[in-house]
Amino acid sequence: MRLTDPGADMLTRVRNALQARHQKVDVPASRLKVEIARILKEEGYISNFKATEEEGHKVIRIYLKYGAHNEAAISKADRVSRPGCRVYVRRSEIPRVLGGMGINILTTPRGVMTGRQARKEGVGGELLCEIW
């Protein structure tokens, strides 16, 4: 079966694993998903991730993060730009998520980065998702 929106599939798998209180989740690998996982780790939303190969398929194993009272580090993860309705923003139009408490992830000509990094570097791009 072919996925029409692999980014949304990754976010959904992570959300479902967090609700089920799993320690890790495997998602099919792609360069974009590895970059999203890297940003989530840098921003402290996941513990770690590892790109591996299992049974001939490349997968990303994402180790989820929970707080002291077993609350998930990610409260909400929403896909913004979709295959049927792409959302592009200029540097000045990049929204702040929860007044700076969350992050948004963009693909830019300089690579995948957070909204904060994109504003700092002065670039816009496709607004992939918002996480808090």
Placement of each model-derived feature along the sequence:
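Core subunits and conserved enzymes of cellular information-processing
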Residues: 1-132
